[in-house]
Amino acid sequence: MRTFPPLFFRSACTSLVHLFVVGLTWLALSARADVYDDVERLIRNGQYERASEQSDARLKTAPSDPQMRLLRSRILDAQGKTGEAVGVLESLTLEFPELPEPHNNLAVLYARQGRTTDAIASLNKALLARPDYTVALENLGDLHLGLALQVYQRAGQTPAAPASATRKASAIAPLLQR
């Protein structure tokens, strides 16, 4: 015949097991958060090789991790590998269209490449994902200001250039310097 521990002992053991599982989960999550913090810090400090090594290590164990892939794109861009960074972000936007950050970051790279139409489309997708995403709203405003500046400058260079076009260009230019 088997004997079972008293009910109190069983519930105490169960509680200890639950606490142990919760503790392990907390440790795993905090360790994972530390990886992101470490990579972010390395990027901020310009230590792109070390950041790349840590992001590669994380992506080997979790290749679809969107947060680390976003950080990876920043590393690649900082290393002058903008084409690869664009590829990472384009892939992220296809796999995770609900995340606004990859759309926004992709728009920044597109704008830097002179692909204004693509940048605007990407920012609009970011805003579809999260309409109150202020970074994307500001970036979209900056793109439109830049386009307005170009148009006013062109208008100011025509033979019958209205003075208002030059005034508007002069008013917009300092806004884009900030």
Q: Where would I find each of the regions flagged by the language model?
A:
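Helix-start (N-cap) detector for alpha-helical repeat units in TPR-like alpha-solenoids
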Residues: R32, P66-Q67, P100-E101, T134, ...
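Structural marker of alpha-solenoid helical repeat scaffolds
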Residues: T61, L94-F96, A129, T158
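Terminal, low-structured helical/coil segments at or just beyond the last alpha-helical repeat
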Residues: D142-R178
